[in-house]
Design a protein with these regions (language model features):
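Bacterial N-terminal signal peptides
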Residues: 9-18
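N-terminal structural segment of carbohydrate-active enzymes
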Residues: 23-150
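Aromatic- and acidic-residue-enriched segments that line the glycan-binding/catalytic groove
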Residues: 31, 56-57, 108-122, 157-204, ...
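Active-site-proximal helices and loops of the catalytic beta/alpha 8
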Residues: 141, 149, 159, 232-333
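Bacterial N-terminal signal peptides that target proteins for export
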Residues: 1-9
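Extracellular/periplasmic catalytic domains that process cell-envelope and extracellular macromolecules
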Residues: 31-36, 90-94, 99, 118, ...
Length: 333
C-alpha cells in the first residue's frame, strides 16, 4: 500500500493527497513536502473580524451566507502570541500548516452574492480589500513564520471571475470592464476560450477544458502567455510571503499540458527563496482512483486530493458501509 498524504481539516473528514501508483512502478517517487503536516483549512472571511474598517466595501452582509461576513487577515493572524486566538491558537491545537482559500481581489458583488470564498478573482496581484491589505498579508506571513506554521495558498488558474459577456455567441467586454482584471494579459479576450457554459459536458468532451465553469471566464491555459503569466503571478506570491504549497482549484479543467509547463517555473520560484519540496496539489473532482492516477501521471500534477478515500471514509463513518469497503479501497489503491 502506498504512503498517503492525509490532510486534517476543520471542515471535513480526512482527505488524502495521493500520488497514485497502481500496476506500473514509479521510478522516481514524488516528494510531497507537506506529507507529515497537520493542515488547518480555513476561509478567512468566516474566521474572525479583526478589522471592522474594511466592512464598508460592497458585498458585506453578515446576515446572508452568500456575501462577505467580515472575517479578515487581521482576525486570522491574531496577536501571534496569545494561544487563544488566531494563528497562535491554531498552532496550540497541534496544526503545523494553514491552508487558506484564495486571497485575491474578487469581481464586483451581484445581487445574488459575492466572492467571499475567493474563487471569482479579477486582480491576482493584490489582496481583496474585504480581507485586508498587502501589509496585513505581510504580517500574517510573518506571524506564521514566527510560529513555524507553513502557509498553503488556494489558487485558481482555470478561470477568472465572470466579466466577459456574450452577444449571439460572440464574446465582448462592456466599456466599464475593459481593464477590470490584473495583470493586463487577463483583459485580452484572445486568451480565453469564449465558448460559453460547460454545463452540458460534465463527462467527456472538449468543453470540459474550454467551457465556462459555472459561468466563470475560462482561460486558454494551453497558451504560453497564460501559463507563463500564471507562473509570474503565483511565483511572486511565493517570493513575497514564503508560501509552502498551492492547492490548485478546478485542476481537471485546465489544458492537459498546463502543469508540465507551469509547475517547473513555480518550483524554481520557490527554490529561489529557499523553499524546497514545494507542494502542488490539484483538485480533481473524481471518485475513481484510476482517473486520478491519469492526472498525476499524464498531466504531471504533483499530487491530487484523494476524493475516493473521502467518499469511502465518509460512508463508513456514517454507517452506510462496513470496514471491508475501506479495506478494499486500500487494497485496490
Amino acid at each position: 500500500m502506498k504512503k498517503r498524504f492525509v490532510l486534517f481539516v476543520v471542515t471535513s473528514l480526512l482527505i488524502g493527497l495521493a500520488s497514485t501508483s497502481f500496476a506500473a512502478p514509479v521510478v522516481d517517487p514524488v516528494k510531497v513536502g507537506l506529507s507529515k503536516d497537520l493542515i488547518y483549512f480555513v476561509f478567512p472571511d468566516r474566521y474572525l473580524n479583526g478589522d471592522t474598517s474594511n466592512d464598508s466595501f460592497p458585498g458585506y452582509n453578515p446576515r446572508d451566507t452568500a456575501f462577505f461576513h467580515g472575517g479578515d487577515l487581521k482576525g486570522l493572524t491574531g496577536t501571534c502570541s496569545d494561544g487563544d486566538n488566531g494563528l497562535a491558537r491554531i498552532k496550540k491545537l497541534g496544526f503545523t500548516a494553514v491552508w487558506v482559500t484564495p486571497l485575491v481581489v474578487q469581481q464586483k458583488p451581484t445581487p445574488n452574492g459575492a466572492g467571499y470564498h475567493g474563487y471569482w478573482g479579477v486582480d491576482f496581484l493584490n489582496v481583496d480589500p474585504h480581507l485586508g491589505t498587502k501589509a496585513d498579508m505581510v504580517a500574517f506571513a510573518a506571524c506564521a513564520k514566527k510560529l513555524n506554521l507553513k502557509l498553503i495558498l488556494d489558487i485558481v488558474t482555470n478561470h477568472t471571475g465572470d466579466v466577459i459577456s456574450y452577444n449571439d455567441k460572440t464574446a465582448f467586454l462592456s466599456s466599464d470592464l475593459l481593464n477590470a482584471k490584473n495583470p493586463a494579459w487577463l483583459n485580452d479576450l484572445s486568451n480565453y476560450h469564449n465558448v460559453g457554459s460547460m454545463s452540458n459536458c460534465w463527462g467527456d468532451g472538449p468543453c470540459i477544458q474550454t467551457g465556462d465553469f459555472f459561468g466563470l471566464d475560462d482561460i486558454a491555459t494551453e497558451k504560453p502567455v497564460v501559463y507563463n503569466g500564471w507562473a509570474d503571478v503565483y511565483g511572486q506570491w511565493i517570493k513575497d510571503y514564503g508560501i509552502s504549497g498551492f492547492r490548485v482549484d478546478t485542476a481537471r479543467h485546465v489544458d492537459d499540458a498546463f502543469f508540465k509547463n507551469w509547475s517547473p517555473q513555480i518550483n524554481a520560484a520557490a527554490k529561489s527563496v529557499g523553499i524546497d519540496n514545494f507542494t502542488i496539489f490539484g483538485e480533481v473532482w473524481d471518485v475513481n482512483p484510476i482517473n486520478l492516477m491519469n492526472y498525476v501521471r499524464r498531466n504531471k500534477i504533483q499530487t491530487v486530493l484523494d476524493f475516493p478515500f473521502q467518499r469511502t471514509a465518509a460512508e463508513f463513518a456514517a454507517g452506510y458501509s462496513d470496514a471491508t469497503v475501506v479495506e478494499n479501497l486500500f487494497a485496490y489503491d
